UniProtKB/Swiss-Prot annotation:
Main location: cytoplasm
Top-level taxon in the UniProt lineage: Eukaryota
A GO biological process held by the record: protein catabolic process
InterPro entries (alphabetical): Aminopeptidase_N-like_N (IPR045357), Aminopeptidase_N-like_N_sf (IPR042097), ARM-type_fold (IPR016024), LTA4H_cat (IPR049980), M1_LTA-4_hydro/amino_C_sf (IPR038502), M1_LTA4H (IPR034015), Peptidase_M1 (IPR001930), Peptidase_M1_C (IPR015211)
Protein name: Leucine aminopeptidase 2
Subcellular location: Cytoplasm; Nucleus
Residues the record lists as binding Zn(2+): H295, H299, E318
Catalytic activity: an epoxide + H2O = an ethanediol
Record's keyword annotation contains Metal-binding: yes
Cofactor note: Binds 1 zinc ion per subunit.
Amino acid sequence: MKLPAVLEERRAAATDRSTLSNYEDFAVRHTNLELEVAFDERQIRAEVCYDLEQTGKGVAEVHLDTSYVQLECILVDGKRVPWELRERQEPLGSQLVITPEGGLPARFQLTCRSVTTARSTAVQWLGGAQTAGKPYVYTQLESVHARSLVPCFDTPACKSPFTVRVRSPLRAVVAGQEQPGSGKDGVYVFEQPVPIPIYLLGLAAGDIACAPLGPRSNVYCEPALLEAAAGEFGGEIERFLDAAEELLPRYIWGNYNLLVCPSSYPYGGMEVAGTSFISPSVIAYDRSNNDLIVHEMAHSWSGNLITNANWGHFWLNEGWTVYLERRITGALHGEDTRQFSSLLGMAELEVAIRASNGASFALVEDVSESVNPDNVVSLAAYEKGSALLLHLERELGGTAAFDPFIKHYFGKFGGQSLTTWQFLDILFDFFADKREKLERIDWKTWLFAPGMPPKLTYSTSLADDVYDLAEQWLEKAVQLRLPEEFAAEFSGSVLAAFTTAQQILFLNTIIQGGVSPDNTFDWTQHPVAAAALLSVYADTLGKSRNQEIIYRRYNFQLTAGMEDAYPEITTWLGSTGRMKHVRPIYRRLASIDKALAASTFQEHREKYHPICRAAIQADLGLS
Protein backbone atom coordinates (compact mmCIF):
# COMPACT_ATOMS: atom_id res chain seq x y z
CA MET A 1 0.00 0.00 0.00
CA LYS A 2 1.45 3.33 -1.06
CA LEU A 3 1.28 6.42 1.08
CA PRO A 4 0.00 9.77 -0.24
CA ALA A 5 2.37 11.44 -2.71
CA VAL A 6 3.47 14.11 -0.23
CA LEU A 7 4.87 11.29 1.91
CA GLU A 8 6.11 8.90 -0.77
CA GLU A 9 8.14 11.60 -2.50
CA ARG A 10 10.11 12.14 0.71
CA ARG A 11 10.50 8.48 1.65
CA ALA A 12 14.11 7.80 2.60
CA ALA A 13 16.18 4.78 3.54
CA ALA A 14 16.48 3.89 7.21
CA THR A 15 20.29 4.11 7.10
CA ASP A 16 21.79 5.78 10.16
CA ARG A 17 24.40 8.31 9.05
CA SER A 18 25.42 9.05 12.64
CA THR A 19 27.48 5.87 12.81
CA LEU A 20 30.76 4.98 11.12
CA SER A 21 30.06 1.26 11.58
CA ASN A 22 28.90 -1.22 8.95
CA TYR A 23 26.06 -2.35 11.19
CA GLU A 24 23.84 -3.32 8.27
CA ASP A 25 26.23 -6.18 7.40
CA PHE A 26 25.79 -7.97 10.74
CA ALA A 27 23.20 -9.14 13.24
CA VAL A 28 24.42 -8.97 16.84
CA ARG A 29 23.08 -12.14 18.45
CA HIS A 30 24.45 -11.34 21.91
CA THR A 31 26.79 -8.89 23.60
CA ASN A 32 28.94 -9.83 26.58
CA LEU A 33 30.46 -6.85 28.35
CA GLU A 34 33.10 -7.02 31.07
CA LEU A 35 33.90 -3.73 32.81
CA GLU A 36 36.40 -2.89 35.52
CA VAL A 37 35.98 0.42 37.33
CA ALA A 38 39.21 2.03 38.57
CA PHE A 39 38.25 5.08 40.64
CA ASP A 40 41.81 6.15 41.43
CA GLU A 41 42.85 6.19 37.77
CA ARG A 42 39.41 7.36 36.61
CA GLN A 43 39.34 4.66 33.98
CA ILE A 44 36.97 1.92 32.90
CA ARG A 45 38.72 -1.09 31.42
CA ALA A 46 36.46 -2.99 29.06
CA GLU A 47 36.29 -6.25 27.20
CA VAL A 48 33.29 -6.46 24.90
CA CYS A 49 32.50 -9.60 22.95
CA TYR A 50 29.97 -9.49 20.12
CA ASP A 51 28.38 -12.66 18.76
CA LEU A 52 28.06 -11.61 15.12
CA GLU A 53 26.32 -13.21 12.17
CA GLN A 54 26.67 -11.85 8.67
CA THR A 55 23.36 -10.74 7.15
CA GLY A 56 24.19 -10.93 3.45
CA LYS A 57 27.06 -11.50 1.10
CA GLY A 58 30.34 -12.10 2.86
CA VAL A 59 32.21 -9.01 3.96
CA ALA A 60 35.91 -8.88 4.76
CA GLU A 61 35.86 -6.16 7.42
CA VAL A 62 34.08 -5.05 10.55
CA HIS A 63 33.77 -1.32 11.11
CA LEU A 64 33.00 -0.07 14.62
CA ASP A 65 32.48 3.33 16.18
CA THR A 66 35.01 4.63 18.70
CA SER A 67 35.64 7.98 20.34
CA TYR A 68 38.53 8.70 22.67
CA VAL A 69 39.01 5.10 23.82
CA GLN A 70 42.44 3.52 24.06
CA LEU A 71 42.45 0.23 22.18
CA GLU A 72 44.53 -2.71 23.42
CA CYS A 73 43.70 -5.63 21.15
CA ILE A 74 41.06 -7.11 18.85
CA LEU A 75 40.28 -10.82 18.56
CA VAL A 76 38.14 -12.86 16.18
CA ASP A 77 37.20 -16.23 17.62
CA GLY A 78 39.94 -15.81 20.21
CA LYS A 79 42.76 -14.96 17.81
CA ARG A 80 44.36 -11.53 17.53
CA VAL A 81 43.66 -9.81 14.22
CA PRO A 82 44.92 -6.64 12.49
CA TRP A 83 43.02 -3.40 12.99
CA GLU A 84 43.30 0.25 12.06
CA LEU A 85 41.95 3.31 13.85
CA ARG A 86 41.21 5.87 11.17
CA GLU A 87 41.49 9.63 11.46
CA ARG A 88 38.86 11.25 13.64
CA GLN A 89 35.77 12.62 11.88
CA GLU A 90 33.92 15.18 13.95
CA PRO A 91 31.39 14.80 15.42
CA LEU A 92 31.28 11.01 14.99
CA GLY A 93 34.68 9.93 16.29
CA SER A 94 37.17 7.48 14.82
CA GLN A 95 36.26 4.50 12.70
CA LEU A 96 37.81 1.22 13.83
CA VAL A 97 38.46 -1.05 10.85
CA ILE A 98 39.07 -4.73 11.62
CA THR A 99 40.42 -6.83 8.74
CA PRO A 100 41.23 -10.44 9.67
CA GLU A 101 43.59 -12.24 7.36
CA GLY A 102 41.61 -14.85 5.50
CA GLY A 103 38.29 -13.02 5.84
CA LEU A 104 35.37 -13.41 8.24
CA PRO A 105 33.27 -16.52 8.86
CA ALA A 106 29.49 -16.39 8.58
CA ARG A 107 29.22 -16.31 12.38
CA PHE A 108 31.99 -15.40 14.79
CA GLN A 109 32.94 -13.85 18.11
CA LEU A 110 34.50 -10.39 17.94
CA THR A 111 36.28 -9.24 21.11
CA CYS A 112 37.62 -5.73 21.74
CA ARG A 113 39.71 -4.74 24.76
CA SER A 114 39.94 -1.06 25.54
CA VAL A 115 40.24 1.60 28.24
CA THR A 116 38.36 4.88 28.56
CA THR A 117 40.31 8.12 28.59
CA ALA A 118 39.84 11.49 30.22
CA ARG A 119 38.15 12.72 27.03
CA SER A 120 35.36 10.15 27.10
CA THR A 121 32.08 12.03 26.69
CA ALA A 122 30.08 9.10 28.03
CA VAL A 123 31.57 9.05 31.51
CA GLN A 124 31.51 11.42 34.44
CA TRP A 125 33.75 10.82 37.44
CA LEU A 126 32.82 12.49 40.71
CA GLY A 127 34.99 12.91 43.77
CA GLY A 128 33.73 12.74 47.31
CA ALA A 129 33.23 16.52 47.41
CA GLN A 130 30.70 16.24 44.56
CA THR A 131 28.66 13.46 46.16
CA ALA A 132 27.52 12.49 49.62
CA GLY A 133 31.12 11.56 50.43
CA LYS A 134 32.46 8.76 48.24
CA PRO A 135 33.62 8.62 44.61
CA TYR A 136 31.03 7.90 41.96
CA VAL A 137 30.93 7.27 38.23
CA TYR A 138 28.03 7.12 35.81
CA THR A 139 27.52 7.01 32.06
CA GLN A 140 25.18 8.81 29.68
CA LEU A 141 25.31 7.10 26.30
CA GLU A 142 22.51 8.68 24.25
CA SER A 143 22.81 9.57 21.48
CA VAL A 144 26.32 8.80 20.16
CA HIS A 145 28.41 8.49 23.32
CA ALA A 146 28.50 4.70 23.79
CA ARG A 147 31.43 4.73 21.35
CA SER A 148 33.45 6.57 24.00
CA LEU A 149 32.85 3.70 26.45
CA VAL A 150 33.62 0.73 24.17
CA PRO A 151 34.04 0.13 20.43
CA CYS A 152 30.55 -0.64 19.17
CA PHE A 153 27.85 -0.42 16.54
CA ASP A 154 26.67 2.86 18.02
CA THR A 155 23.29 3.15 16.35
CA PRO A 156 19.69 2.75 17.52
CA ALA A 157 19.15 0.45 14.54
CA CYS A 158 21.33 -2.30 16.05
CA LYS A 159 19.95 -4.26 19.00
CA SER A 160 21.12 -7.23 21.01
CA PRO A 161 20.65 -8.91 24.39
CA PHE A 162 23.39 -8.08 26.90
CA THR A 163 25.21 -9.77 29.74
CA VAL A 164 27.22 -7.28 31.79
CA ARG A 165 29.74 -7.99 34.55
CA VAL A 166 31.24 -5.08 36.43
CA ARG A 167 34.20 -5.40 38.76
CA SER A 168 34.11 -2.45 41.14
CA PRO A 169 35.17 -1.68 44.72
CA LEU A 170 31.81 0.09 45.13
CA ARG A 171 28.36 -1.14 44.21
CA ALA A 172 27.52 -1.09 40.50
CA VAL A 173 24.15 -0.82 38.77
CA VAL A 174 23.61 -1.59 35.07
CA ALA A 175 20.63 -1.76 32.72
CA GLY A 176 18.82 -5.05 33.18
CA GLN A 177 18.07 -7.43 36.01
CA GLU A 178 20.65 -8.07 38.71
CA GLN A 179 21.48 -11.75 38.98
CA PRO A 180 21.66 -13.98 42.10
CA GLY A 181 25.12 -13.80 43.65
CA SER A 182 25.80 -10.39 42.12
CA GLY A 183 28.24 -8.41 44.23
CA LYS A 184 30.27 -11.39 45.42
CA ASP A 185 33.99 -10.57 45.38
CA GLY A 186 33.16 -7.14 43.96
CA VAL A 187 31.68 -8.45 40.71
CA TYR A 188 28.18 -7.26 39.82
CA VAL A 189 26.25 -9.22 37.20
CA PHE A 190 23.26 -8.06 35.16
CA GLU A 191 21.28 -9.68 32.37
CA GLN A 192 19.31 -7.79 29.74
CA PRO A 193 17.50 -10.50 27.76
CA VAL A 194 15.41 -8.06 25.71
CA PRO A 195 17.47 -6.81 22.74
CA ILE A 196 18.39 -3.13 23.07
CA PRO A 197 20.65 -0.67 21.24
CA ILE A 198 23.78 0.08 23.19
CA TYR A 199 22.74 3.66 23.98
CA LEU A 200 20.11 2.19 26.34
CA LEU A 201 22.82 0.58 28.42
CA GLY A 202 23.86 2.48 31.50
CA LEU A 203 26.42 2.09 34.27
CA ALA A 204 26.66 3.69 37.69
CA ALA A 205 29.07 2.75 40.48
CA GLY A 206 29.54 4.34 43.86
CA ASP A 207 28.18 4.34 47.38
CA ILE A 208 24.77 3.06 46.26
CA ALA A 209 22.03 1.75 48.53
CA CYS A 210 18.77 0.08 47.52
CA ALA A 211 15.19 0.10 48.81
CA PRO A 212 12.02 -1.54 47.48
CA LEU A 213 9.32 0.65 45.95
CA GLY A 214 6.80 -2.03 45.11
CA PRO A 215 6.41 -5.68 44.09
CA ARG A 216 8.44 -5.18 40.90
CA SER A 217 10.46 -2.05 41.54
CA ASN A 218 13.43 -0.81 43.56
CA VAL A 219 15.23 2.48 43.93
CA TYR A 220 19.03 2.82 43.95
CA CYS A 221 20.76 5.96 45.21
CA GLU A 222 23.33 7.27 47.64
CA PRO A 223 22.41 6.36 51.25
CA ALA A 224 21.89 10.00 52.24
CA LEU A 225 19.06 10.28 49.71
CA LEU A 226 17.50 6.85 50.16
CA GLU A 227 14.78 7.84 52.64
CA ALA A 228 13.70 10.80 50.51
CA ALA A 229 13.68 8.74 47.30
CA ALA A 230 11.74 5.87 48.85
CA GLY A 231 9.25 8.35 50.28
CA GLU A 232 8.83 10.12 46.97
CA PHE A 233 8.38 7.07 44.77
CA GLY A 234 7.24 4.30 47.13
CA GLY A 235 3.91 2.78 46.08
CA GLU A 236 3.83 4.86 42.90
CA ILE A 237 5.57 2.56 40.44
CA GLU A 238 3.09 -0.31 40.59
CA ARG A 239 0.19 2.11 40.18
CA PHE A 240 1.86 3.59 37.12
CA LEU A 241 2.65 0.16 35.66
CA ASP A 242 -0.93 -1.02 36.15
CA ALA A 243 -2.25 2.04 34.32
CA ALA A 244 0.29 1.59 31.52
CA GLU A 245 -0.59 -2.07 31.04
CA GLU A 246 -4.25 -1.13 30.57
CA LEU A 247 -3.25 0.85 27.48
CA LEU A 248 -0.23 -1.10 26.23
CA PRO A 249 1.02 -4.68 25.93
CA ARG A 250 2.36 -6.10 29.18
CA TYR A 251 5.63 -4.81 30.62
CA ILE A 252 8.35 -7.29 29.55
CA TRP A 253 11.48 -5.92 31.26
CA GLY A 254 11.21 -7.67 34.64
CA ASN A 255 11.53 -5.08 37.38
CA TYR A 256 11.13 -1.39 36.67
CA ASN A 257 13.80 0.24 38.83
CA LEU A 258 14.99 3.79 39.42
CA LEU A 259 18.55 4.98 39.91
CA VAL A 260 18.72 8.46 41.42
CA CYS A 261 21.99 9.92 40.16
CA PRO A 262 24.11 12.64 41.75
CA SER A 263 23.05 16.23 41.13
CA SER A 264 25.34 16.68 38.11
CA TYR A 265 23.21 14.29 36.03
CA PRO A 266 22.44 16.25 32.83
CA TYR A 267 18.88 15.08 32.17
CA GLY A 268 15.67 14.79 34.14
CA GLY A 269 15.72 11.13 33.31
CA MET A 270 17.17 8.60 30.89
CA GLU A 271 15.30 5.48 29.88
CA VAL A 272 18.11 3.04 30.63
CA ALA A 273 16.40 -0.27 29.95
CA GLY A 274 14.75 -1.64 33.09
CA THR A 275 16.40 0.94 35.37
CA SER A 276 15.64 4.56 34.58
CA PHE A 277 18.44 6.94 35.57
CA ILE A 278 16.90 10.11 37.03
CA SER A 279 18.07 13.43 38.39
CA PRO A 280 17.64 14.09 42.12
CA SER A 281 15.87 17.28 41.00
CA VAL A 282 12.83 15.08 40.39
CA ILE A 283 12.44 14.64 44.15
CA ALA A 284 10.08 17.47 45.13
CA TYR A 285 9.19 16.05 48.57
CA ASP A 286 5.50 16.11 47.63
CA ARG A 287 5.44 13.70 44.62
CA SER A 288 4.50 16.58 42.31
CA ASN A 289 7.19 15.74 39.73
CA ASN A 290 6.36 12.07 39.43
CA ASP A 291 4.91 12.50 35.97
CA LEU A 292 8.55 12.37 34.85
CA ILE A 293 8.68 8.82 36.19
CA VAL A 294 5.63 8.00 34.07
CA HIS A 295 7.48 9.44 31.08
CA GLU A 296 10.57 7.31 31.64
CA MET A 297 8.41 4.26 32.27
CA ALA A 298 6.49 4.85 29.04
CA HIS A 299 9.83 4.63 27.23
CA SER A 300 9.73 0.92 28.09
CA TRP A 301 7.47 0.69 25.06
CA SER A 302 8.27 3.77 22.95
CA GLY A 303 12.00 4.11 22.50
CA ASN A 304 13.11 0.91 24.19
CA LEU A 305 10.76 -1.64 22.60
CA ILE A 306 10.22 0.25 19.34
CA THR A 307 13.15 2.55 18.64
CA ASN A 308 13.84 5.26 16.08
CA ALA A 309 16.03 3.74 13.37
CA ASN A 310 18.12 6.89 13.23
CA TRP A 311 18.15 10.21 15.07
CA GLY A 312 16.25 12.05 12.35
CA HIS A 313 13.15 10.18 13.55
CA PHE A 314 13.65 10.93 17.24
CA TRP A 315 9.98 11.85 17.57
CA LEU A 316 9.10 8.15 17.32
CA ASN A 317 10.87 7.79 20.67
CA GLU A 318 9.85 11.00 22.40
CA GLY A 319 6.60 12.04 20.75
CA TRP A 320 5.10 8.64 21.42
CA THR A 321 6.42 8.72 24.97
CA VAL A 322 4.88 12.11 25.78
CA TYR A 323 1.60 10.95 24.25
CA LEU A 324 1.64 7.75 26.34
CA GLU A 325 2.72 9.63 29.47
CA ARG A 326 -0.30 11.91 29.14
CA ARG A 327 -2.65 9.03 28.42
CA ILE A 328 -1.43 7.29 31.58
CA THR A 329 -1.61 10.40 33.78
CA GLY A 330 -5.00 11.19 32.28
CA ALA A 331 -6.21 7.74 33.31
CA LEU A 332 -4.87 8.34 36.82
CA HIS A 333 -5.89 11.98 37.33
CA GLY A 334 -8.59 12.72 34.77
CA GLU A 335 -8.83 13.88 31.16
CA ASP A 336 -8.61 17.56 32.16
CA THR A 337 -5.12 16.84 33.51
CA ARG A 338 -4.12 15.34 30.18
CA GLN A 339 -5.50 18.33 28.30
CA PHE A 340 -3.75 20.76 30.63
CA SER A 341 -0.39 19.01 30.19
CA SER A 342 -0.81 19.19 26.42
CA LEU A 343 -1.64 22.90 26.58
CA LEU A 344 1.34 23.58 28.84
CA GLY A 345 3.65 21.60 26.56
CA MET A 346 2.52 23.43 23.45
CA ALA A 347 3.01 26.80 25.16
CA GLU A 348 6.56 25.81 26.14
CA LEU A 349 7.24 24.67 22.56
CA GLU A 350 6.18 28.07 21.24
CA VAL A 351 8.50 29.83 23.69
CA ALA A 352 11.38 27.52 22.72
CA ILE A 353 10.84 28.15 19.00
CA ARG A 354 10.80 31.92 19.48
CA ALA A 355 14.03 31.76 21.48
CA SER A 356 15.82 29.40 19.09
CA ASN A 357 17.41 31.85 16.64
CA GLY A 358 16.04 30.10 13.59
CA ALA A 359 16.41 26.42 14.50
CA SER A 360 14.20 24.17 12.39
CA PHE A 361 11.97 22.38 14.92
CA ALA A 362 10.78 20.13 12.09
CA LEU A 363 9.50 16.78 13.27
CA VAL A 364 11.54 14.75 10.77
CA GLU A 365 15.13 15.97 10.54
CA ASP A 366 17.90 15.21 8.05
CA VAL A 367 20.76 14.18 10.33
CA SER A 368 23.82 13.96 8.09
CA GLU A 369 27.34 12.79 8.91
CA SER A 370 28.36 16.33 9.81
CA VAL A 371 25.57 16.82 12.35
CA ASN A 372 25.91 15.94 16.02
CA PRO A 373 22.63 14.20 16.92
CA ASP A 374 22.77 15.83 20.34
CA ASN A 375 22.23 19.15 18.58
CA VAL A 376 18.99 18.18 16.83
CA VAL A 377 17.20 17.25 20.03
CA SER A 378 14.44 19.78 20.62
CA LEU A 379 10.97 20.08 22.09
CA ALA A 380 9.60 19.42 18.61
CA ALA A 381 10.20 15.68 18.98
CA TYR A 382 8.38 15.72 22.31
CA GLU A 383 5.56 18.21 21.85
CA LYS A 384 5.00 18.30 18.10
CA GLY A 385 5.26 14.51 18.04
CA SER A 386 2.75 13.98 20.82
CA ALA A 387 0.42 16.59 19.30
CA LEU A 388 0.47 14.71 15.98
CA LEU A 389 -0.54 11.51 17.76
CA LEU A 390 -3.31 13.35 19.61
CA HIS A 391 -4.47 14.76 16.26
CA LEU A 392 -4.51 11.25 14.79
CA GLU A 393 -6.45 9.99 17.79
CA ARG A 394 -9.09 12.69 17.31
CA GLU A 395 -9.33 12.39 13.52
CA LEU A 396 -9.58 8.60 13.52
CA GLY A 397 -12.42 8.30 16.01
CA GLY A 398 -11.11 9.01 19.49
CA THR A 399 -9.47 6.67 21.97
CA ALA A 400 -11.96 3.87 21.21
CA ALA A 401 -10.58 3.70 17.67
CA PHE A 402 -6.97 4.61 18.39
CA ASP A 403 -6.29 2.36 21.39
CA PRO A 404 -6.46 -0.90 19.39
CA PHE A 405 -3.83 0.60 17.07
CA ILE A 406 -1.57 1.34 20.06
CA LYS A 407 -1.63 -2.30 21.16
CA HIS A 408 -1.17 -3.48 17.57
CA TYR A 409 1.78 -1.16 16.98
CA PHE A 410 3.71 -2.00 20.13
CA GLY A 411 2.64 -5.64 20.19
CA LYS A 412 3.46 -6.56 16.60
CA PHE A 413 6.46 -4.34 15.95
CA GLY A 414 8.16 -4.45 19.34
CA GLY A 415 11.87 -5.14 19.06
CA GLN A 416 12.23 -3.23 15.79
CA SER A 417 13.85 0.09 14.92
CA LEU A 418 11.62 2.13 12.62
CA THR A 419 11.56 5.29 10.54
CA THR A 420 8.65 7.69 10.17
CA TRP A 421 7.75 6.07 6.84
CA GLN A 422 7.60 2.61 8.38
CA PHE A 423 5.38 4.00 11.14
CA LEU A 424 3.13 5.56 8.50
CA ASP A 425 2.99 2.27 6.55
CA ILE A 426 1.75 0.57 9.71
CA LEU A 427 -0.74 3.36 10.42
CA PHE A 428 -2.23 3.44 6.91
CA ASP A 429 -2.43 -0.35 6.80
CA PHE A 430 -4.24 -0.58 10.14
CA PHE A 431 -6.68 2.20 9.27
CA ALA A 432 -7.15 1.19 5.62
CA ASP A 433 -10.89 1.76 6.01
CA LYS A 434 -10.22 5.36 7.08
CA ARG A 435 -7.72 6.28 4.39
CA GLU A 436 -9.71 9.34 3.33
CA LYS A 437 -9.39 10.77 6.83
CA LEU A 438 -5.66 10.06 6.88
CA GLU A 439 -5.18 11.71 3.48
CA ARG A 440 -6.84 14.90 4.74
CA ILE A 441 -4.14 15.37 7.38
CA ASP A 442 -1.62 18.09 6.53
CA TRP A 443 1.36 15.74 6.64
CA LYS A 444 3.72 18.22 4.99
CA THR A 445 3.26 20.77 7.76
CA TRP A 446 3.18 18.27 10.60
CA LEU A 447 6.29 16.34 9.60
CA PHE A 448 8.53 18.57 7.53
CA ALA A 449 7.72 22.23 8.15
CA PRO A 450 9.72 24.26 10.66
CA GLY A 451 8.11 26.04 13.58
CA MET A 452 4.79 25.36 15.25
CA PRO A 453 2.48 22.54 14.13
CA PRO A 454 -1.12 23.08 13.04
CA LYS A 455 -3.06 24.41 16.01
CA LEU A 456 -5.06 22.01 18.16
CA THR A 457 -7.64 22.98 20.76
CA TYR A 458 -7.39 21.87 24.37
CA SER A 459 -9.66 22.11 27.36
CA THR A 460 -8.65 25.18 29.36
CA SER A 461 -10.59 24.30 32.51
CA LEU A 462 -7.39 24.04 34.58
CA ALA A 463 -5.70 26.97 32.84
CA ASP A 464 -8.35 29.70 32.93
CA ASP A 465 -7.83 30.66 36.58
CA VAL A 466 -4.06 30.63 36.07
CA TYR A 467 -4.22 32.95 33.09
CA ASP A 468 -6.65 35.24 34.92
CA LEU A 469 -4.28 35.57 37.88
CA ALA A 470 -1.28 36.23 35.65
CA GLU A 471 -3.14 38.88 33.67
CA GLN A 472 -4.26 40.56 36.89
CA TRP A 473 -0.62 40.85 37.97
CA LEU A 474 0.43 42.30 34.62
CA GLU A 475 -2.40 44.82 34.77
CA LYS A 476 -1.77 45.85 38.38
CA ALA A 477 1.99 46.02 37.82
CA VAL A 478 1.31 49.05 35.63
CA GLN A 479 -1.35 50.60 37.87
CA LEU A 480 -0.06 50.17 41.42
CA ARG A 481 3.01 51.80 42.96
CA LEU A 482 3.36 50.64 46.56
CA PRO A 483 4.11 47.18 48.04
CA GLU A 484 1.15 47.44 50.42
CA GLU A 485 -1.19 48.01 47.49
CA PHE A 486 -0.15 44.69 45.98
CA ALA A 487 -0.48 42.99 49.38
CA ALA A 488 -4.06 44.26 49.61
CA GLU A 489 -4.89 43.24 46.04
CA PHE A 490 -3.48 39.69 46.02
CA SER A 491 -3.60 36.76 48.43
CA GLY A 492 -0.87 34.16 48.74
CA SER A 493 -3.49 31.47 49.29
CA VAL A 494 -4.65 31.66 45.67
CA LEU A 495 -1.36 30.47 44.17
CA ALA A 496 -0.90 27.99 47.02
CA ALA A 497 -4.20 26.35 46.05
CA PHE A 498 -2.99 25.69 42.51
CA THR A 499 -1.39 22.39 41.56
CA THR A 500 2.32 22.44 40.85
CA ALA A 501 1.60 22.25 37.12
CA GLN A 502 -0.66 25.30 37.42
CA GLN A 503 2.02 27.15 39.38
CA ILE A 504 4.47 26.37 36.58
CA LEU A 505 2.06 27.77 34.00
CA PHE A 506 1.60 30.88 36.13
CA LEU A 507 5.35 31.47 36.31
CA ASN A 508 5.80 30.79 32.60
CA THR A 509 3.07 33.30 31.77
CA ILE A 510 4.46 35.92 34.13
CA ILE A 511 8.00 35.51 32.79
CA GLN A 512 6.94 35.96 29.16
CA GLY A 513 4.72 38.90 30.11
CA GLY A 514 1.36 37.50 29.07
CA VAL A 515 -0.57 34.53 27.75
CA SER A 516 0.81 35.13 24.26
CA PRO A 517 4.55 35.33 23.65
CA ASP A 518 3.77 38.37 21.46
CA ASN A 519 4.05 41.07 24.09
CA THR A 520 6.17 44.02 25.09
CA PHE A 521 5.82 43.83 28.87
CA ASP A 522 9.15 44.60 30.54
CA TRP A 523 9.48 43.52 34.18
CA THR A 524 12.60 45.64 34.64
CA GLN A 525 10.32 48.69 34.42
CA HIS A 526 8.20 47.43 37.32
CA PRO A 527 10.61 46.52 40.15
CA VAL A 528 8.05 47.17 42.92
CA ALA A 529 5.57 44.79 41.31
CA ALA A 530 8.23 42.11 40.79
CA ALA A 531 9.33 42.29 44.42
CA ALA A 532 5.70 42.32 45.57
CA LEU A 533 4.90 39.18 43.59
CA LEU A 534 7.70 37.27 45.30
CA SER A 535 6.64 38.67 48.67
CA VAL A 536 2.94 37.81 48.31
CA TYR A 537 3.80 34.27 47.20
CA ALA A 538 6.82 33.80 49.47
CA ASP A 539 5.40 30.69 51.11
CA THR A 540 4.71 29.03 47.76
CA LEU A 541 7.61 30.21 45.61
CA GLY A 542 10.26 31.10 48.17
CA LYS A 543 9.96 27.94 50.25
CA SER A 544 9.37 25.44 47.45
CA ARG A 545 11.75 22.47 47.28
CA ASN A 546 10.60 21.67 43.76
CA GLN A 547 13.34 22.45 41.25
CA GLU A 548 10.74 23.14 38.55
CA ILE A 549 9.50 26.04 40.69
CA ILE A 550 12.93 27.13 41.89
CA TYR A 551 14.47 27.48 38.44
CA ARG A 552 11.47 29.44 37.16
CA ARG A 553 11.65 31.74 40.17
CA TYR A 554 15.29 32.42 39.32
CA ASN A 555 14.34 32.98 35.69
CA PHE A 556 11.75 35.53 36.81
CA GLN A 557 14.25 37.32 39.03
CA LEU A 558 16.70 37.58 36.13
CA THR A 559 13.92 38.72 33.80
CA ALA A 560 13.01 41.44 36.30
CA GLY A 561 16.65 42.52 36.72
CA MET A 562 16.71 41.73 40.44
CA GLU A 563 20.46 41.99 40.97
CA ASP A 564 20.26 41.14 44.67
CA ALA A 565 19.31 37.59 43.59
CA TYR A 566 22.41 37.07 41.44
CA PRO A 567 24.63 35.57 44.20
CA GLU A 568 21.97 33.00 45.10
CA ILE A 569 21.40 32.16 41.45
CA THR A 570 25.07 31.74 40.58
CA THR A 571 25.55 29.51 43.64
CA TRP A 572 22.55 27.40 42.62
CA LEU A 573 24.06 26.94 39.14
CA GLY A 574 26.83 24.97 40.82
CA SER A 575 24.39 22.73 42.69
CA THR A 576 22.70 21.05 39.73
CA GLY A 577 23.70 19.88 36.27
CA ARG A 578 20.26 19.24 34.80
CA MET A 579 20.42 20.93 31.41
CA LYS A 580 16.71 21.76 31.28
CA HIS A 581 17.28 24.03 34.28
CA VAL A 582 20.81 25.38 34.03
CA ARG A 583 20.97 26.16 30.31
CA PRO A 584 18.04 28.63 30.28
CA ILE A 585 19.41 30.35 33.38
CA TYR A 586 22.89 30.67 31.86
CA ARG A 587 21.39 32.05 28.65
CA ARG A 588 19.23 34.54 30.53
CA LEU A 589 22.16 35.57 32.73
CA ALA A 590 24.38 36.01 29.68
CA SER A 591 21.81 38.29 28.07
CA ILE A 592 22.13 40.57 31.11
CA ASP A 593 25.75 40.16 32.18
CA LYS A 594 27.83 38.00 29.84
CA ALA A 595 30.95 38.32 31.97
CA LEU A 596 29.12 37.06 35.07
CA ALA A 597 27.66 34.14 33.12
CA ALA A 598 31.10 33.21 31.79
CA SER A 599 32.84 33.47 35.16
CA THR A 600 30.07 31.45 36.84
CA PHE A 601 30.45 28.73 34.23
CA GLN A 602 34.23 28.66 34.63
CA GLU A 603 33.77 28.30 38.39
CA HIS A 604 31.38 25.36 38.07
CA ARG A 605 32.37 23.72 34.76
CA GLU A 606 34.08 20.68 36.29
CA LYS A 607 30.92 19.86 38.22
CA TYR A 608 28.96 19.32 35.01
CA HIS A 609 28.73 16.21 32.88
CA PRO A 610 30.73 16.57 29.62
CA ILE A 611 27.51 16.74 27.58
CA CYS A 612 26.16 19.56 29.74
CA ARG A 613 29.52 21.33 29.82
CA ALA A 614 29.75 21.36 26.02
CA ALA A 615 26.17 22.60 25.65
CA ILE A 616 26.60 25.52 28.05
CA GLN A 617 29.94 26.40 26.48
CA ALA A 618 28.23 26.59 23.08
CA ASP A 619 25.32 28.60 24.51
CA LEU A 620 27.73 31.16 25.92
CA GLY A 621 29.92 31.27 22.83
CA LEU A 622 33.00 30.16 24.75
CA SER A 623 35.82 28.24 23.09
